[in-house]
């Protein structure tokens, strides 16, 4: 499964344990792109709403992401967690390390684009200042994380200790591994952004193998 060789230390390599973020080991070289917002807000969207088959979002999710059956997060072959981000963060398939002020690093991959009308500065959402929106299966996630208002984690993953904290740095991940400097050619090419701008998601057909 995806956790094998993905930078996570986890007793159960078949599923993603959020607590493993505390011991996450970065595998790829990265370059800081600065912080456009330090917001701690971390909202979510359900991936099953993307329906445009021709969009880069749909194609990337369909071909490179797997729904974790424990937490409902979507993860790619590198173990990066699927999120929606603004236009400042490039094309679909671009990977980042999100460093929090708690010392935790969250590896994310842009699988959907925040609509420009909803994030006019290209970074944070106008209505809640969130920089990242986790792309999840909300049914699985609700069963795992819970919530008191009908929303997963009451609508904000910052309510979860493992994800709590303000953004301290955002680093663009390269194809070059830290330990050996060899290009990891098996990683998927970044896809071109489509005209689809809705913050929405669609079912996954792909999967990982050991």
Show the residue positions of the predicted features.
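Sec-dependent N-terminal signal peptides of Gram-positive bacterial secreted proteins and lipoproteins
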Residues: 1-9
């Amino acid at each position: 499964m995806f956790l094998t060789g993905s930078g996570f230390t986890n007793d159960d390599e078949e599923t993603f344990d959020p607590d493993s973020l505390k011991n996450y080991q970065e595998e790829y070289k990265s370059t800081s792109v600065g912080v456009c917002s330090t917001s701690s807000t971390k909202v979510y969207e359900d991936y099953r709403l993307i329906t445009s088959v021709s969009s880069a979002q749909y194609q990337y999710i369909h071909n490179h992401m797997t729904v974790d059956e424990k937490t409902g997060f979507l993860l790619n072959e590198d173990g990066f967690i699927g999120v929606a981000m603004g236009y400042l963060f490039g094309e679909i398939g671009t990977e980042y390390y999100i460093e929090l002020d708690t010392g935790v690093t969250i590896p994310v991959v842009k699988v959907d684009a925040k609509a420009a009308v909803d994030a006019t500065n290209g970074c944070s959402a106008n209505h809640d200042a969130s920089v990242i929106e986790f792309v999840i299966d909300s049914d699985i996630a609700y069963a795992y994380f819970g919530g008191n208002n009908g929303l997963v984690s009451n609508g904000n993953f910052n309510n979860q200790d493992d994800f709590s904290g303000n953004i301290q740095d955002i680093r663009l991940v390269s194809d070059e591994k830290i330990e050996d400097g060899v290009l990891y050619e098996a990683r998927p090419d970044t896809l071109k952004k489509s005209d689809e701008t809705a913050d929405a998601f669609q079912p996954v057909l792909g999967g990982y193998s050991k």
